[in-house]
A protein has these predicted regions:
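Cyclophilin-like peptidyl-prolyl cis-trans isomerases
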Residues: 1-168
Length: 168
C-alpha cells in the first residue's frame, strides 16, 4: 500500500507519495513528525522561484529543527526532478525536520540531499506558494505504522528528544 502525505496549506492541498523503500529512515522521521503535529502551523520560510519551496523550521527562519540530526539516504536512486520532496540540510548527515519541494529539476542536489517523495497532486499549489504561507497540517495516509516500526529504535530515540524539548 502506498504512503501519502497530505499537506493542507494556505494555498490548497498538496499530496505527496512517500518512498519508504528508498529512504526508510527519512520517511520514518517525516511520518513521525507529521503524526506528532510537528509541522502544523509552520510556514514555508524559504521560497525561491523556479527552484523550490522550503518548510519544516519551527523557528520560521531556516535555523531550527527537531533537536536531533540524522544521516543522509541521498544515494537511493531517486533524483531531484520537478515535484520531489527532499530533505534540507546544512551539510552531510544534518537532516532534521526541514524539507523542500522542487519547482524544477535540480540535479546538482543529487547525492547531497535525500529525496523521499514525489508530488502526485497539487503541483499547481506548490508553484503558487509564497514565502510565509502556512502549512496548516500534514496528515499521513497508508501504513504509517509500518514506516515508523521499520526504524522503531531511532523513532523512540527521536521522540525522547522531542518530548524533552516540549517540556523545556
Amino acid at each position: 500500500m502506498s504512503l501519502i502525505a497530505h499537506f493542507d496549506t494556505d494555498r490548497g492541498p498538496i499530496r505527496v507519495e512517500l518512498a519508504p523503500d528508498k529512504a526508510p529512515l527519512t520517511v520514518a522521521n517525516f511520518v513521525n513528525l507529521a503524526r506528532r503535529g510537528f509541522y502544523d502551523g509552520l510556514s514555508f520560510h524559504r521560497v525561491i522561484n523556479d527552484f523550490m519551496v522550503q518548510g519544516g523550521c519551527p523557528k520560521g527562519t531556516g535555523t531550527g529543527g527537531p533537536g536531533y540530526k540524522f544521516e543522509d539516504e541521498a544515494r537511493n536512486g531517486l533524483g531531484h526532478e520537478r515535484g520531489v520532496l527532499s530533505m534540507a540540510n546544512a551539510g552531510p548527515n544534518t537532516n532534521g525536520s526541514q524539507f523542500f519541494i522542487t519547482h524544477v529539476a535540480t540535479p546538482w542536489l543529487d547525492g547531497k540531499h535525500t529525496v523521499f517523495g514525489k508530488v502526485i497532486e497539487g503541483m499547481d499549489v506548490v508553484d503558487g506558494v509564497k514565502q510565509g504561507d502556512t502549512i496548516r497540517s500534514v496528515k499521513i495516509e497508508g501504513d504509517a505504522d509500518a514506516a515508523v516500526a521499520a526504524k522503531a529504535d531511532r523513532v523512540a530515540e527521536w521522540n525522547k528528544t522531542l518530548d524533552a524539548n516540549a517540556r523545556a
